[in-house]
């Protein structure tokens, strides 16, 4: 009750753009302190009322009034004052429109990608479609780190699906792209445009969902020291038994051309021979770009609250950036950065080589994959001994499986994906996902409920109230509760603070 009363923002009589409910400035802090003293005095008077029923009614009215006023305070606040589209319902309206226009809920396997970040990371939940994007925060450390290592944008544990390359999209089953810009018609096929001006594209050529591969090396993890391009080539070469890199990293030197206080201007000159996409990537720890120009043209790096953003890397946009398609030319890239924080890495993806790879890829097996609720059903015929199936689905100990009626081992690959060993001939596989600790949680909850019922309706009636035995049982139960509660808060909250401080110390050292 007291936290609800004390921590609520001040009552707003008139809602307007200059005084939004979300702002807690100095005057608000003073108002909270004054109101806290007032409520403390008021509660002291209320608690002196001897009539328990009257006392409880008055306290309830006070608390509910504050909750009601708090709710009303958020009505009418302009979108730009409450976090922009990212934290308002406008992005949900756009996602609903896309769902209605493109029937995204009919897509079972292949994933979607919001390349301009017109939506929040949770758009797949609204559009009922597959995607690597998520705002749920319930993701593993391996999933978060691999997401970044492959060059997709990430804001702490919010995973976005913009970034990456044509290669990583193909491997991860990202077939459909939502974009407010026109896409390369040599690579993409346009499927339609929504009323909000967002286009739906799909790759003209695509790898099958799930890759049959042969590899006896230990590829459960990806070397931590690999950059985004090395990571993509590592995955590509190990899945498809290739010796050459698909993505060609470029070694180039930056040239300082201007220095004005905290702002420094650099120029990169990159020679691109065969027709290629030119990619760029930078880390937030050593790069802070304010403006970027490619052959004199400004580069925008959009995100949901600012489609004209030019900062990079930004906490909302820090994945691989596609700078465009070039052939037989020198590409000049000018950047204006903070002081000298400019450590960008460039690479090219030769389009003819990539398209030939996709077009010529063949699997000598018949494969069917169906996903429904928490089950994945897979049928593979004509498999050879030693072959494996790569699934671009997050590995978790909660997965169990059977293959032809026998237990199927589920292996981790590339830090966070699933690999299945296949049997020679026909494989009829069914995978089922149940959160790893869910059964234990249910069992503990039932056991706790049984103990409470036995104590309340059994033991408590047989022992003396407030007697020694009663006090021992109550204090023991309360002690266990405190230990569990403190442990929970330590694990969820305090450990995060400790880890953050350790990271700060590491950066200082």
Locate predicted features.
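Membrane-embedded transmembrane-helix bundle of lipid-linked glycan/lipid transferases
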Residues: 1-82, 427-430, 439-509
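Beta-sheet entry/capping signal
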Residues: 56-62, 109-112, 175-176, 198-200, ...
């Amino acid at each position: 009750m007291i936290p609800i009363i004390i921590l609520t923002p001040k009552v707003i009589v008139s809602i307007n753009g200059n005084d939004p409910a979300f702002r807690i400035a100095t005057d608000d802090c003073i108002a909270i302190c004054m109101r806290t003293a007032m409520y403390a005095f008021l509660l002291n008077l209320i608690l002196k009322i001897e009539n328990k029923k009257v006392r409880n009614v008055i306290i309830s009215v006070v608390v509910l009034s504050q909750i009601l006023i708090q709710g009303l305070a958020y009505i009418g606040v302009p979108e730009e004052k409450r976090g922009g589209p990212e934290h308002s319902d406008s992005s949900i309206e756009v996602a609903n429109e896309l769902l209605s226009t493109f029937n995204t809920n009919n897509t079972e396997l292949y994933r979607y990608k919001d390349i301009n970040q017109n939506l929040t990371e949770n758009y797949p939940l609204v559009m009922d479609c597959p995607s690597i994007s998520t705002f749920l925060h319930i993701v593993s450390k391996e999933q978060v780190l691999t997401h970044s290592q492959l060059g997709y944008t990430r804001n702490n544990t919010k995973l976005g699906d913009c970034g990456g390359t044509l290669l990583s999209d193909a491997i991860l089953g990202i077939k459909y792209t939502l974009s407010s810009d026109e896409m390369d018609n040599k690579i993409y096929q346009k499927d339609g445009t929504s009323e909000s001006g967002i286009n739906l594209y799909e790759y003209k050529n695509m790898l099958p969902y799930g890759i049959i591969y042969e590899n006896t090396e230990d590829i459960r993890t990806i070397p931590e020291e690999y950059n985004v391009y090395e990571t993509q080539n590592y995955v590509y070469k190990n899945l498809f038994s290739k010796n050459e890199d698909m993505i060609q990293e470029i070694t180039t030197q930056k040239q300082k051309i201007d220095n004005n206080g905290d702002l420094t201007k650099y120029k990169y000159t990159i020679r691109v021979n065969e027709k290629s996409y030119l990619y760029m990537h930078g880390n937030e720890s050593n790069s802070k770009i304010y403006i970027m120009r490619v052959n004199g043209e400004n580069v925008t790096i959009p995100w949901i609250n600012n489609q004209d953003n030019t900062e990079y890397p930004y906490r909302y946009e820090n994945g691989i950036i596609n700078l465009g398609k070039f052939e037989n030319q020198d590409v000049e890239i000018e950047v204006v950065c903070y002081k000298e924080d400019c450590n960008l890495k460039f690479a090219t993806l030769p389009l003819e080589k990539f398209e030939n790879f996709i077009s010529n890829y063949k699997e000598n097996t018949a494969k069917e994959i169906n996903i429904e609720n928490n089950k994945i059903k897979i049928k593979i015929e004509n498999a050879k001994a030693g072959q494996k199936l790569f699934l671009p689905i997050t590995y978790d100990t909660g997965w169990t499986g059977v293959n032809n009626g026998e237990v199927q081992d589920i292996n981790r690959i590339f830090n966070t994906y699933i690999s299945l060993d296949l049997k020679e001939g026909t494989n009829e596989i069914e995978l089922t996902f149940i959160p790893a600790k869910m059964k234990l949680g249910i069992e503990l909850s039932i056991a706790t409920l049984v103990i409470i019922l036995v104590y309340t309706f059994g033991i408590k009636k047989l022992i003396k109230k407030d007697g020694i035995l009663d006090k021992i049982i109550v204090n023991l139960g309360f002690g266990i509760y405190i230990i569990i509660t403190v442990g929970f808060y330590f694990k969820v909250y305090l450990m995060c603070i400790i880890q953050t401080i350790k990271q700060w110390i590491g950066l200082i050292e």
